[in-house]
Amino acid sequence: MRYIGAHVSASGGVQNAPLNAAKIGANAFALFVKNQRQWSAKPLESAAISEFEQNCKAANISPRHILPHDSYLINLGHYDDAKREQSFNAFVDEIERVSELGLELLNFHPGSHLNEISQNECLNLIAECMNEALKRTDGVKLVIENTAGQGSNLGFRFEQLAYLIERTDDKSRVGVCIDTCHAFAAGYDLRTPEAYKKTMDEFDAVIGYEFLSAMHLNDCKFGLNSRKDRHESLGKGFLGLKAFECIMNDEHIGEIPMILETIDDSIWADEIKILRNLQKGKK
């Protein structure tokens, strides 16, 4: 079984996200558990939490197939101690909110060195924050997303993700989310069965399929190794549908959330159908 959805709106309250997922025929979804462009937010209300859980059950969507995404403001690798602490505190707050909702995953971008410190120094700061966050919280798995390599963002090479995993004390609470657009933009080809196998064999050798906890399924507006993070609708970008056919039929991929972040939410329901039709045997 493939668990496919999109990053849906939680406007009006988190309880609305599963309703929006159900409208597009999803059996997985992503959401922000607070405003992604503000540092602080009022606590989740117990009524909203209860309604969220009820709506997930009504939509027949399991907590393990829901992928909360953290705030875009957070940079766990910030060179400035005070700004990194602000990011860390916001990160812990996000984990606690995810836990309150009864969810198991938190997807996040590793961080940026901002051309002020070395890549390794930045990665070490991120790992320190991850370990401290794990000590202060329970249950939630930290799911590191690969990046396109734009600007000073880290996480665009599999080796950088592996570096963070290696330095995480509790390996049971760390995983990876592969964003197909980001991977392609960072130089990992997925366009043919041969290219896909080469890239995923490298992923398995460097990181391991056992750490693959989620995927973002996005086509790409720019070509291979562009280092530009610009998503496109499935089959309308430089990746093409063959890449997604390979993913849908990759028996090494477990029952993880597969999330669309494509640019036209009016066709998400159609894109979910496209993905299901690409799967041989339609499991």
Curated annotation (Swiss-Prot):
It comes from the Bacteria. The keyword Nuclease applies. Keywords: DNA damage, DNA repair, Endonuclease, Hydrolase, Metal-binding, Nuclease, Zinc. Pfam families: AP_endonuc_2. Zn(2+) 1 binds at H69, H109, E145. InterPro entries: AP_endonuc_2, AP_endonuc_F2_Zn_BS, Xyl_isomerase-like_sf, Xyl_isomerase-like_TIM-brl. Binds 3 Zn(2+) ions. It catalyses: Endonucleolytic cleavage to 5'-phosphooligonucleotide end-products. Zn(2+) 2 binds at E145, D179, H216, E261. SUPFAM superfamilies: Xylose isomerase-like. Belongs to the AP endonuclease 2 family. This is Probable endonuclease 4. The lineage of its organism: Bacteria, Pseudomonadati, Campylobacterota, Epsilonproteobacteria, Campylobacterales.
